[in-house]
């Protein structure tokens, strides 16, 4: 992987150092229950415990950074029964060093993972357990794939030495008042909110490398910030009139049973949603504002399209005086030269979601608008990979001192 950052990147979410839990290192309070962190003596396997009562136990030595080639990194996946959790498991199946030791899914506790996701039945995995029964004593790092609003207390209760990548929205916004406004409840871990580093890998890789807690970006923000952040930092486009039309596959809405996501409701159609204010808007505006060093607002309309996975973002921008669409193209080309997972297409090639499905790639291109002074930028990603689980693995690779592409060299599926 290349190491080019976008003009040095936006300010990272670096702040308060991790604090010791009030219950010490063996037992951690977590929203009304206790997380067990005692090891099983003489065994490397995961032990699931229903009781939190125990005598003091010897602590394991976590691998926090600089992992050697071939050295095992022990992984916990929280919320493994959702789409992003399952995608983490799929990606790690071919990872040479990450080994899953703990998998949680409260509603599927006690079940085998292969019975929940039969396409992964060949994998040797631990049974699913409830979060409250999970034993983190044999774990070095955590992928948290739980819904927003549920992760704050859980992450507060995890052992302080663990590396954590959170795929929810709980730690993405720097302003806790803005979080409360958009998500409808106050933030319950403001000290972690200050500590967390935003995980847009190609922009903030140096900060991610040294982080303990990374807030993995949302899918729409990833597809939009990757092309726009470098252009805004270079002052090649105006920030006063950015219009974005984005389309996502249905998996972006999650695996929960919802009437709006039934086949008969979405088949052979496309519809806009979140028109007045999608929750990814403040995340996008936060990243663009940091790039501009001034407040940026956008017009953003997401659409749900009848396909399983994939995302396309079409961005309509006004160029700075004297700037051409080719200038935008050349700047993006030089910015992402050497980057493995961000590719600028040649000539008039139009990015297609089908060409990135199953991969960690972001394909993009720039087109001249028929209106003088304006340009159209199109980017595509797989919303479950580069827009979620793939970027999460990319980030943890960085945090553990591994090459970013480790376990992610999947080519897109076609047809």
Curated annotation (Swiss-Prot):
Cite the annotated pathway: Amino-acid biosynthesis; L-arginine biosynthesis; N(2)-acetyl-L-ornithine from L-glutamate: step 3/4
Localization, UniProt: Plastid, Chloroplast
- Stretch list, region Disordered: 48-68
InterPro entries attached to this UniProt entry: AGPR_AS, AGPR_type-1, NAD(P)-bd_dom_sf, NAGSA_dehydrogenase, Semialdehyde_DH_NAD-bd
Which reaction does this chain catalyze? N-acetyl-L-glutamate 5-semialdehyde + phosphate + NADP(+) = N-acetyl-L-glutamyl 5-phosphate + NADPH + H(+)
Note whether NADP occurs among the keywords. yes
* Biased segments, Polar residues type: 56-67
Family assignment from sequence similarity: Belongs to the NAGSA dehydrogenase family. Type 1 subfamily.
Instruction: List the protein's name.
Output: Probable N-acetyl-gamma-glutamyl-phosphate reductase, chloroplastic
Organism from which the protein derives: Oryza sativa subsp. japonica (Rice)
């Amino acid at each position: 992987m290349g190491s080019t950052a976008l003009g040095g990147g936006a300010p990272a979410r670096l702040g308060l150092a991790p604090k010791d839990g009030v219950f010490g290192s063996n037992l951690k309070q977590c929203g009304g229950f206790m997380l067990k962190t005692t090891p099983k003596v003489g065994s490397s396997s995961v032990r699931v415990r229903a009781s939190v009562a125990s005598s003091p136990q010897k602590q394991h030595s976590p691998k926090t950074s600089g992992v050697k080639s071939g050295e095992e990194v022990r992984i916990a996946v929280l919320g493994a029964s959702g789409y992003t959790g399952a995608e983490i498991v799929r990606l790690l199946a071919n990872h040479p060093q990450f080994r899953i030791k703990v998998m949680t899914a409260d509603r599927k506790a006690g079940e085998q993972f292969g019975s929940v996701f039969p396409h992964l039945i060949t994998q040797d995995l631990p049974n699913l357990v409830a979060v409250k029964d999970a034993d983190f004593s044999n774990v070095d790092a955590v992928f948290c794939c739980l819904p927003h609003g549920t992760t704050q207390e859980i992450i507060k209760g995890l052992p302080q030495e663990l590396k954590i990548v959170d795929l929810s929205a709980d730690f993405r916004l720097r302003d806790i008042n803005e979080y409360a406004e958009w998500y409808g409840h106050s933030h319950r871990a403001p000290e972690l909110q200050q500590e967390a580093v935003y995980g847009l890998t190609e922009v903030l890789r140096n900060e991610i490398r040294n982080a303990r807690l990374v807030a993995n970006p949302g899918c729409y923000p990833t597809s939009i910030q990757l092309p726009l952040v470098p252009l805004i930092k270079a002052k090649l486009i105006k920030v006063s009139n950015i219009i974005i039309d984005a389309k996502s596959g249905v998996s972006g809405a999650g695996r929960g049973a919802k009437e709006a996501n039934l086949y008969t409701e979405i088949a052979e159609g496309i519809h806009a949603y979140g028109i007045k204010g999608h929750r990814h808007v403040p995340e996008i505006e936060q990243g663009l504002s940091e790039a501009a060093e001034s407040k940026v607002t956008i017009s953003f309309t997401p659409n749900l399209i009848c396909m399983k996975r994939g995302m396309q973002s079409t961005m309509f921008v006004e160029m700075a005086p004297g700037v051409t669409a080719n200038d935008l193209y050349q700047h993006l080309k030089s910015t992402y030269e050497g980057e493995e997972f961000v590719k600028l297409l040649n000539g008039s090639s139009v990015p297609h979601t089908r060409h990135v499905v199953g991969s960690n790639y972001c394909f993009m291109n720039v087109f001249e608008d028929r209106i003088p002074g304006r340009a159209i930028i199109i980017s595509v990603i797989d919303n479950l990979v580069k827009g979620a689980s793939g970027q999460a693995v990319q980030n943890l690779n960085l945090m553990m001192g591994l090459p970013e592409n480790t376990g992610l060299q999947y080519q897109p599926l076609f047809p």
